[in-house]
């Protein structure tokens, strides 16, 4: 699985700036999705062929009477303890603060590899920046400027060397004994463990690997209606007797890793609770990772007609950027709606892995343009000439032509909807990439 790097520090030391710099390559993928909040605390970065997950743990502002452990949210502590590397950020301009010492004392006890990073060091000599922070006892400080990018690449490369060294050997994704990899994600108490038992059943478990530590994943291989699946369990599920129970401990780190490792994600919501920012953040990460998605709205049997209408309206309003995914209203406890949910899992996986022939893509593009041409931008009208597939999981459609920088987001969504309709691409994000050339020979040879 992708290693996790946790960003830690008191408020206003530049964690968000560093987070944005580390994840900037991913932001553009979801920035134009209507309804998706940009206020995220986790994302993906990549250095060469090495991807990693980043968690911004928020700011710590300890007060004397409570101490640092009381000020740190449970989720923050858990994220730090489960991360592969902790990047502890301090402020080079303002120097060492009492809060820094409190945080350092806590971090030393976690046993995690810690990188002490002095931010806002632009224009300052290293000795002047670093001297005070040796007092924290966390080794040599690394001076960076998150705002300007100075020193960031070297720092993250060092962190990844440590993070990847601790990663177990990757399982073979092409192993024929493994079926579609499914991650069931959601807040605590939405019914994840109940859904697992409804899917697997007491006699359907083929293999169960008990983790060596709480930071490992559990893979459960099972069959349903003659099809093979692999459940990636990062929700704290443990087997008790012949069934699974949930240790109700929501883990951001485990959720991110399970989404990254999955072929299809089931986002489980509680019909009896309003959709939260946490639900939307998880959903946004699924889209950012390009994972196929099915939405399960659980505990549907407990609602009257009025409450059901309200729940559907809440889903449409708050998660409208997931309009490509099918929603199923289920009761995991009563095992109603599970069959249809799993059929959508199969369909979403098929759509994510679909092969789209160039002639058919180009024909669909031409028909879309003939039905509705892109708007002019000044004297220029974009010319969309042909399309081909650039990747799978999620499908990537590359469109070639002239002046494609002038294509609006609205027209891009129009094309996406046309491609979805033509090729039945339900349940998967779809990427469209434009490649302009004013040189008629640029796309040849």
From Swiss-Prot:
What are the recorded GO MF terms, alphabetically? ATP hydrolysis activity; GTP binding; ribosome binding
At the top level, the lineage of the source is Bacteria
Residue ranges occupied by any KH-like domain in the UniProt entry: 354-438
* Positions contributing to GTP 1 binding: 9-16, 56-60, 119-122
What are the binding positions for GTP 2 in this chain?
A: 186-193, 233-237, 298-301
Give start and end of each EngA-type G domain. 3-167, 180-353
Signal peptide range in chain numbering: none
Q: Which PROSITE patterns match?
A: G_ENGA
Keywords for this protein: GTP-binding, Nucleotide-binding, Repeat, Ribosome biogenesis
Task: Set out the biological process GO terms recorded for this chain's protein.
Answer: ribosome biogenesis
SUPFAM superfamilies named among the record's database cross-references? P-loop containing nucleoside triphosphate hydrolases (SSF52540)
Q: Which NCBIfam families match?
A: GTPase_EngA, small_GTP
Q: Which HAMAP family match?
A: GTPase_Der
Q: Which PANTHER family match?
A: GTPASE DER (PTHR43834:SF6)
Q: How does it assemble?
A: Associates with the 50S ribosomal subunit.
This molecule's function is given as: GTPase that plays an essential role in the late steps of ribosome biogenesis.
The UniProt similarity line reads: Belongs to the TRAFAC class TrmE-Era-EngA-EngB-Septin-like GTPase superfamily. EngA (Der) GTPase family.
Entry protein name: GTPase Der
Q: Which organism is it from?
A: Burkholderia ambifaria (strain MC40-6)
């Amino acid at each position: 699985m992708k290693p996790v790097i946790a960003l830690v520090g008191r408020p206003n030391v530049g964690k968000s700036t560093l987070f944005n710099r580390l994840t900037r390559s991913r932001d553009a993928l979801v920035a134009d999705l209507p309804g998706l909040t940009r206020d995220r605390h986790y994302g993906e970065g990549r250095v060469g062929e090495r991807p990693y997950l980043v968690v911004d743990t928020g700011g710590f502002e300890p007060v004397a009477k409570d101490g640092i452990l009381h000020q740190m949210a449970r989720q923050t502590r858990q994220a730090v303890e489960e991360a592969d590397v902790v990047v502890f950020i301090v402020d080079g301009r303002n120097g060492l603060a009492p809060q820094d010492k409190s945080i350092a004392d806590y971090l030393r006890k976690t046993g995690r590899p810690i990188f002490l990073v002095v931010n806002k060091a632009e224009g300052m000599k290293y000795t002047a920046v670093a001297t005070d922070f040796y007092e924290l006892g966390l080794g040599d400080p690394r001076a960076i400027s998150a705002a300007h990018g100075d020193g960031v690449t070297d720092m993250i490369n060092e962190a990844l060397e440590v993070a990847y060294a601790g990663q177990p050997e990757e399982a073979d994704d092409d192993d024929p004994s493994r079926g579609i990899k499914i991650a069931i994600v959601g807040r605590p108490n939405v019914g994840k463990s109940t859904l697992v038992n409804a899917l697997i059943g007491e006699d359907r478990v083929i293999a169960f690997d008990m983790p060596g530590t709480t930071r490992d994943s559990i893979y459960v291989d099972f069959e349903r209606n003659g099809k093979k699946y692999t459940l990636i369990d990062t929700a704290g599920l443990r087997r008790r007797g012949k069934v699974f129970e949930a240790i109700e401990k929501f883990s951001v780190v485990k959720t991110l890793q399970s989404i990254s490792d999955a072929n299809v994600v089931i986002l489980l919501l509680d019909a009896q609770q309003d959709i939260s920012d946490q639900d939307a953040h998880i959903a946004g990460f699924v889209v950012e990772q390009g994972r196929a998605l099915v939405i399960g709205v659980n505990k549907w049997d407990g609602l009257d007609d009025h409450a059901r209408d309200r729940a559907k309206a809440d889903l449409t309003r708050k998660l409208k950027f997931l309009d490509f995914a099918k929603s199923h209203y289920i009761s995991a406890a009563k095992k109603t709606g599970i069959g249809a949910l799993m059929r959508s899992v199969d369909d979403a996986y098929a759509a994510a892995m679909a092969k789209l022939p160039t002639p058919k893509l180009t024909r669909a593009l031409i028909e879309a343009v003939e039905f509705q041409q892109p708007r002019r931008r000044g004297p220029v009208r974009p010319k969309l000439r042909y399309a081909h597939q650039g990747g799978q999981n999620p499908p990537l459609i590359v469109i070639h032509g002239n002046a494609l920088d002038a294509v609006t987001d609205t027209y891009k969504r129009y094309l996406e909807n046309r491609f979805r309709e033509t090729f039945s691409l339900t349940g998967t994000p779809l990427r469209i990439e434009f490649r302009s050339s004013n040189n008629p020979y640029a796309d040849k040879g």
